Swiss-Prot record:
Gene: SDC1
Ranges per topology, Extracellular: 23-255
SMART domains per record: 4.1m
Basic and acidic residues composition bias: residue spans: 151-162, 169-180
Phosphoserine PTM positions: S286
Main subcellular location of this protein, as a coarse class: membrane
Pfam families on file: Syndecan
Organism: Bos taurus (Bovine)
Domain of life: Eukaryota
Biased composition regions of type Acidic residues, renumbered to the chain: 32-42
Protein's UniProt name: Syndecan-1
Biological role: Cell surface proteoglycan that contains both heparan sulfate and chondroitin sulfate and that links the cytoskeleton to the interstitial matrix. Regulates exosome biogenesis in concert with SDCBP and PDCD6IP. Able to induce its own expression in dental mesenchymal cells and also in the neighboring dental epithelial cells via an MSX1-mediated pathway.
Amino acid sequence: MRRAALWLWLCALALRLQPALLHSVAVNMPPEDQDGSGDDSDNFSGSGAGALPDITSSHTPSTWKDLGPVTTTATAPEPTSPDAIAASTTILPTGEQPEGGRAVLLAEVEPGLTAQKEATHPPSETTLHPTTHSVSTARATMAPGPATSHPHRDVQPDHHETSAPTGRGRMEPHRPHVEEGGPPATEKAAEEDPSTQIPVGEGSGEQDFTFDLSGENAAGAAGEPGSRNGAPEDPEATGATGASQGLLDRKEVLGGVIAGGLVGLIFAVCLVGFMLYRMKKKDEGSYSLEEPKQANGGAYQKPTKQEEFYA
């Protein structure tokens, strides 16, 4: 009985797993390429993971706003009576009760010092900035400035507001300090924004054609200052040209070069004249350079007179 139940359970499990196996095989197998172009094989990977997911890259423009002057306005004047100070300092949130009245005594003795210390902390964001007394609350409002940023200017990131409350609890507006010599703020924001980086696509054969241009860009950026300042790029070539210029600057070397050129020119003229003379003698029929000599030593002889006798 147990064996029959076990066999039935195994058969049901096999029937349930069969559609899932058929679906995975159908997904992993590439479609039939009927036209023979091979375009359908690019959508599948050889690892058996199925069809590759479509990767969509979204580019969100980064916005950078300059922080304007921080202005604080007091809603009510500071209390001057001891009762009001005590009432304002005893109101604390839950979980931060004073121990033995010591903190209350310190607040009563030095209310101005604690208010100045609390006011010196820099505001983190556009949030409420309460002081130590609850009666006189001050709100810090961030005035957004224009979004245009000048080149080679950057707002100082570590800006702290150190102005203490003067008069009736008002704080003087402190403008952010701008220094020169840095890259534009928009370029920094674009570099730090991860959404601007486009992901690398996956597929068969794409890794073979991926080139890393960061080293070349760094080498080109490092070589630009030298080329702008007129620095030599190849020290060996510049050394050779400098040595040749130094040799030509000497008068002895320059005179020797000119004399050698003149001697060569004279030798070429003589060679051409000799060749022309040989060609002329060849046309006359004599290949020797000397004049032809007569056999009798050059003496003149009269021809013999022949007499004819008539019969």
